[in-house]
């Protein structure tokens, strides 16, 4: 199937989800815009300056269709305010029947890189999570197009709810997270020219989302580092610290 047909199929699925959802009550819509001092993806410094990342999603009974983009605001890798990446995703998430403590997700992502020389690519993913102490989770991504390799992320997190509140629907939380990821030789060879599987990157993050009804404002900071020596040598900026603020609205 050609890339254009895949893109049309993904867009059709997202729109179909939205059309179906509008006729039902079990529906969620969301829009968001994040502003960060860098764009770091899986430990890779993609844009080393301020970016804006708008997104939109529609959900229906566990299914979610979403569109996410990255805008280079200062012309680091493309012209000012142009998009250098647009992602289209379909996700299904739920709990395991009879085991409400454990959840799972599965989906598809189409990565497009407008205004760049990079070819688009596609991934399937699947994940498991547990509603236990530190919320352990694992997520496997398989790039079956350009990289033909896997990226497996192990994560933990903790949320301190309502560290401050100003009424029933006005409060703020403290959200902490950490992850480490392993990538196979195919993935590392494509992205770094390293023909070995390795633990690639580790990330820690902290955020303080302020919730005002359906509106959330979330300042956050994060730090990531490349772990494997060969991968570190292949990346220009192996250690990254960044921060920013996200705005989201659900209805």
Model-derived features: where do they sit?
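Residues on the lipid-exposed face of transmembrane beta-strands in outer-membrane beta-barrel proteins
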Residues: 33-35, 54-60, 88-94, 108, ...
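Short loop/turn motifs that connect adjacent beta-strands in outer-membrane beta-barrel proteins
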Residues: 22-28, 95-103, 116-118, 133-135, ...
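Short glycine/proline- and aromatic-enriched beta-strand/turn motifs that initiate or cap beta-hairpins
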Residues: 23-74, 90, 181
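Outer-membrane beta-barrel translocator domains and adjoining extracellular loop/strand segments
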Residues: 43-47, 76-83, 116-122, 139-140, ...
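Detector for outer-membrane/organellar transmembrane beta-barrel domains
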Residues: 121-195, 223
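Residues that define the transmembrane beta-barrel architecture of outer-membrane proteins
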Residues: 25-27, 48-52, 82-86, 102, ...
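Cleavable N-terminal export/targeting peptides
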Residues: 1-28
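Transmembrane beta-strand segments that form the barrel wall of outer-membrane beta-barrel proteins
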Residues: 33-39, 63-73, 102-114, 124, ...
């Amino acid at each position: 199937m050609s890339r254009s047909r895949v893109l049309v199929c993904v867009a059709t699925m997202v729109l179909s989800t939205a059309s179906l959802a509008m006729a039902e009550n079990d529906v969620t819509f969301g829009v968001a815009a994040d502003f960060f001092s860098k764009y770091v993806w899986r430990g890779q410094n993609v844009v080393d300056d301020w970016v804006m990342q708008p997104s939109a999603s529609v959900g229906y009974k566990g299914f979610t269709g979403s569109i996410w983009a990255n805008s280079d605001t200062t012309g680091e890798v493309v012209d000012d305010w142009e998009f250098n990446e647009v992602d289209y995703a379909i996700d299904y998430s739920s709990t395991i029947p009879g085991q409400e403590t454990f959840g799972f997700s599965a989906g598809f992502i189409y990565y497009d890189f407008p205004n760049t020389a990079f070819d688009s690519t596609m991934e399937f993913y699947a994940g498991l999570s547990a509603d236990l102490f530190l919320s352990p989770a694992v997520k496997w991504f398989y790039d079956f197009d350009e990289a033909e390799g896997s990226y497996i992320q192990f994560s933990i997190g903790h949320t301190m709810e309502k560290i401050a509140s100003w009424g029933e629907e006005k409060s703020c939380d403290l959200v902490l997270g950490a992850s480490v990821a392993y990538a196979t030789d195919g993935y590392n060879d494509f992205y770094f020219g390293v023909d070995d599987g390795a633990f690639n990157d580790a990330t820690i993050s902290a955020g303080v989302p302020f919730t005002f009804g359906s509106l959330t404002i979330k300042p956050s900071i994060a730090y990531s580092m490349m772990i494997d020596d060969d991968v570190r040598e292949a990346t220009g900026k192996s250690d990254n610290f960044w921060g920013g603020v996200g705005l989201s609205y659900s209805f």
